[in-house]
Amino acid sequence: MAKLFFRYGAMGSSKTANALMVEYNYRERGKKAVLAKPKTDTRDGRNIISSRIGLSSPCILVEELEQMPDEKIKGYDCVIVDEAQFCNKSQVELFVHIVDDLNIPVICYGLRADFKNELFEGSMWLLAWADVIEEIKTVCWCGKAAKCNARYDKNGIIRK
């Protein structure tokens, strides 16, 4: 039985690298996984996912996945979503449909909360509906476990 996974972590915890490695592992075993990201993620261009360590791969947009008929989605062995915090409720509902009705695993990677520790919309719904929730751990610049993100400007940390 397929499951919906939400793997979250602070910035710099290798979420994107993990997503790319999972897709590679599927491909290496002769399986077909699709990488997707929301259109609001423009960091690396429209149809590419890149990690800070230099890994990259083509992807589709979640919005394209929304338009895809179920029969085409059934051609995938796994759906892997990067930057899932930027998804909206209906997109997360689509992931639930893919898992529950099409029996295809969906693995979502993203931030849990913003710099004010407020949940992103996509993360909120993934935390509510995911079958498996996993934290990807990393270390903060201070040496302790990284649990949240900070936003900086020329004067230091922004708190509002």
Regions found by a protein language model. Give the residues of each.
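Conserved P-loop
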Residues: M1-E71, D114-W125, E135-T138, K147
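Residue-level preference for the first positions of well-ordered beta-strands
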Residues: L4-F6, K32-V34, D77-I80, P105-I107
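Sequence-level detector for tyrosine residue identity
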Residues: Y8, Y24-Y26, Y76, Y109, ...
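A residue-level signal for conserved active-site and pocket-lining positions in enzyme catalytic cores
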Residues: A19, D82, A130
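Short glycine/proline-enriched coil/turn segments at helix->beta-strand junctions
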Residues: R29-K31, K74-Y76, A130
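Conserved P-loop NTPase "ATPase switch" module shared by AAA+ and STAND
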Residues: I73-C87
